[in-house]
């Protein structure tokens, strides 16, 4: 070895030692950061606490009834949760407004949006009911202003309506005028130094549950495909977690608070299975169920409806990476007895009540039984469905109507007398029928009626039982093939078999008349006429008139117009 090579050798040794020393001081892995998210879905403008049933082993029948929800309670819950984490993110999964009780609906749902703004909602996926009054009216509710197709309701609660105060998201709702999404597809919220991406979507089949007018200028694309397309873009922005917020749902027989429930079924399951693995959690809505289920490795949640539950999620997020090491979820019951009311929300609720009661408390009529519920028997018939169909048949009598049909999804509550009162009031009746759909009369042939009834059973397994009016009846068999479950020859009107080639005059609401809920046979009706009366007005008139005649209507039990043989 030459004297020139020795210094080089010593230098190399020194560098190696330094490198080894450096290994001893490698930075430890970054600790996960807890990001808290609180979600509600399907609030539907319920400003007040309202009836909810929960499983309770201590109750005589295993079910406890209470009043849950209401903006005062929801606000109180958020106040308490924010004491633990002031940076929690409050979000929605659609149908926050629309299909609302009159306390909110008579003011174009502006009090509900005002409440959510005060509660600092960060974002929401759009639901189908946000589109009840069409694209332009939804955009007004989003952005503010008073130019509305509901001039007697918009800007009546406040002279100036500033907008929702939070963005709606939809990756799959396309404005046909531009070919682009009507709304931002996603939003990134930065909390505790972490980037959390929320991607919104509405159910692909939204056109089947929104009126044709409501969907004008809009179309939808597949939920999962629309979300998956955005994953590379989100990753380029360095997000630490991706949350899908989809207004589509499912159901399970398991309790709303069961961890990692495993029996979830319905449309949301297919969406969940097809989502990119980069999606960390799926917050759902639409089906009005509470669950915390797993679909494969993906957690899928929903918080019932009407403000009854709040879904709380804690994501353990790894700084500097898109990596979630843990997710904990709970569905919290919005029990007014457990959470002190938020003073600001309580004041808003009382203001709305005080300004609405002169209309809402107006007596309508007596009923022959209380409650009259929308709970279906095994055949799919409900006591309240019977009553509403009878009211619509009475409204169509002058137009020759022989049969009325009512969709169960349009019946939004039960009818029950308040303690000490003998008559229902306007607010109670309007809560049950909030959509103000015009009634339409038209003709279908007898053979078309049977085809129509067979459309109640959907390919995915749902049974959307139409409610039928007095004098109309049929029988069905669950063991018969899809598309032919109505027993041939069992469809009768006033005790006589319906004749295949004879025309029969029907009356239905405008939503059904346009083929809503995928009842396409209604669109084949001929000799159409607009009754120029709404479903709500027909029910109010029927209740009032029968009460005045001393013949109050309604029953606690279904009338047996629909019979399931097996």
Q: Which residues are covered by each model-predicted region?
A:
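Hard-cation-handling environments
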Residues: 324-424, 447
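Acidic, metal/ion-coordinating pockets
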Residues: 24-338, 379, 383-394, 404, ...
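C-terminal motif of bacterial Sec signal peptides marking the signal peptidase cleavage site
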Residues: 19-22
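Bacterial N-terminal signal peptides that target proteins for export
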Residues: 2-11
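Feature captures C-terminal
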Residues: 33-36, 46, 156-186, 294-298, ...
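Acidic/histidine-rich, surface-exposed loop or edge segments in extracytoplasmic proteins
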Residues: 44-62, 364-375, 433-435, 517-525
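Extreme N-terminus of proteins, especially the signal/transit-peptide cleavage junction
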Residues: 3, 26-33, 356, 360
